[in-house]
Regions:
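Extracellular low-complexity Ser/Thr/Asn/Gly-rich intrinsically disordered segments
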Residues: 1-351
């Protein structure tokens, strides 16, 4: 089994590449709502006014004292890429002649939700000045959920068509690229060509950035591998290597450095996910490939808060690492043996 480990995390987003929505992420079983939100998804917060037609003011805060001596003293959370996204509506504005129900719409970021729990609270506050006299205010407590996920699927090597989650793919080992006789050693030297494997990685329910890491299992001694990523689903541009090409040893993982990836500003609902695309280039070299070899690319990731991706089915930490996998098989080339009636083939150089 071929296992290439892509670990390491780099804080900077590589070369300005930003990811857009591609394949849909796997569904999650987490139940979310405005009081139990997930990062990157818009939520409505609303309240019924009686009588209506007064003035409303919505704001969020982590303060536990809201009003002192008749004046607002809570520290309001401003809109920004690391708090509440600027797409918020009816937020921190005085809305006159308010209708009932009144509402605000906000998208929480991963950063502002980090560490929020019952003892480190977050609130959405509504202040209401009635149309005739006096005022009132009410508070919603927000207890978020970490629903950050990362999934992986195969892309068909001929045509670059994404396959369904869990669908395997296969291709033949490449044809021989070169063959020559090496006079000093009296041996044949074969180059068994290059195979390229393609994958899509989908991250969802986060803001800011995510940093993936990978394992790839199955490479054999004599093969070399280069792992690259891009946000271009056609693989025509932006390919960036995750470290240098490395030589494989049967049964030994290879390590590559991961890179932080940000979603495109055009993506406003991160529950739909964003995608990066992975190309794995295998140089077979002296490895002949006389057996079917299963290659498994697995992925993990952390969000901008260094929180790991969850298990889609349980919404908890996975039972094991690198549980999101995609499998492809390199199908064996034919075996050719010498006929004893003729004699022996020229000995070949082995890995």
């Amino acid at each position: 089994m071929l296992l290439v480990l892509v670990t390491g995390m780099v804080a900077n987003v590589a070369f300005g590449q930003t990811a857009v929505t591609g394949s849909a992420p796997r569904p999650i079983s987490c139940s979310d709502d405005p009081l139990h939100p997930i990062a990157g998804k818009p939520y409505d917060y609303s309240a019924i006014l009686s009588p209506a037609a007064g003035s409303t003011y919505w704001y969020a805060t982590k303060s536990t004292t809201f009003v002192t001596a008749g004046a607002r003293t809570a520290t309001e959370i401003l809109t920004s890429p690391t708090t509440i996204l600027s797409s918020a509506t009816n937020y921190r504005v005085v809305a006159t002649n308010a209708t009932s129900p009144t509402k605000t719409n906000v998208t929480w970021t991963s950063e502002i939700l980090k560490g929020v729990d019952a003892t480190n609270p977050l609130f959405m506050v509504l202040e209401y000045k009635g149309p005739t006299c006096s005022n009132n205010m009410k508070v919603y407590q927000v207890l978020p959920k970490n629903a950050f996920t990362v999934d992986i699927l195969n892309i068909k090597s001929n045509g670059l068509t994404p396959l369904a989650y869990g669908t395997t793919d296969s291709q033949c080992y490449a044809d021989i690229a070169s063959a020559k006789y090496d006079a000093p050693t009296s041996k044949m030297v074969y180059d068994y060509g290059i195979n390229k494997l393609y994958f899509e990685v989908v991250a969802a329910n986060f803001t800011g950035s995510f940093t993936p890491s990978f394992t790839l299992s199955g490479l054999k001694t004599g093969q070399k591998v280069l792992v690259e990523w891009t946000v271009d689903k056609t693989f025509a541009s932006g390919l960036t290597a995750l470290g240098a090409e490395q030589s494989a040893t049967t049964g030994t993982p290879l390590n590559f450095a991961g890179t932080a990836v940000s979603p495109s500003p055009t993506v406003t609902d991160l529950t739909k996910g964003v995608s990066i695309y992975i190309r794995v280039t295998v140089k077979n070299g002296l490895y002949e490939g006389l057996t079917d070899d299963k290659l498994v690319l697995a992925v993990e990731a952390v969000n901008i808060n260094n929180e790991p991706d969850i298990d889609n089915a349980t919404c908890a930490a996975p039972a094991s690492t690198y549980e999101d996998t995609a499998e492809q098989t390199l199908n064996m080339r034919p075996t050719v043996n010498p006929d004893p009636a003729t004699g022996a083939f020229v000995v070949q150089t082995l890995p």
